Amino acid sequence: MSARCFRGNTELAGLDPANRGLAYGDGVFETMRVHGGELPLWPRHLVRLREGARRLAIPLPDDAVLQSHAEAVAAGCEAGVLKLLLTRGSGGRGYSAASATEAEWMLALHPLPAAASDALQLVWCDTPLPVQPLLAGIKHCNRLEQVLARMEVDRAGADEGLVCDADGQVVSATAANLLVLRGGRWLTPPLERCGVAGVLRGWLLEAGLVTVEPLSRDAVLAADALALCNAVRGILPVGRLGDRNWPPHPSFDELKARLSMAYPMFSRPEAAA
């Protein structure tokens, strides 16, 4: 892993130990696919980053500065993952951010995970996502529910897990959005109360390939096919959820083909990582 840290436009040797992102999760982040030294989904990630910074009232560095440094870190990397972490900086008394310093941010380049060889094996997670409309949709740094849910997935030896809100409505996987095929239509749960609005989910909605609709556990289990999507993996088929199995479905191939036409990086084998 290689990383670079900044305060505003000034490069730092590292993040301050008093950084509010480390202390309180006071920040937002983006996890981006690198392909051929470029960041094909950068414009979409920047939109979500801006929205997260706006909601948390964190001053965002200049777009051109962010992009130039991100592109510099990604350059020369054929296939990888770039994480951009933006925090409020350091300072303030306790939770108060009144005297916080200028925003601090970090870029870290990671290898692309190994490709998955089979359809994903999923479990239901018992850890619920809390309802908080003020934070719903953005990728803020407080991810403890996802950490706990992922521990359940690891204990079960599964690839991923589905999480629900406190009312039992299905929200997403721990690190991906959920796609459910019913009656010839691909559906995805609403995210106005909790969850992360993935940039790839956003593209699918804008392209008219997916529709937002509330989904219960029973509705998910009654689906004709399931898939997960995120900006690093692309779209992946689900083969099993608990005791329910799904064979390959032609609608999944059609959906993935549409995505690959728009973003060829997701047609490559490592897109299944």
What does each model-found stretch correspond to?
Residues M1-A72, G76, T87, G92-A273:
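Helix-start/capping segments and mature chain N-termini
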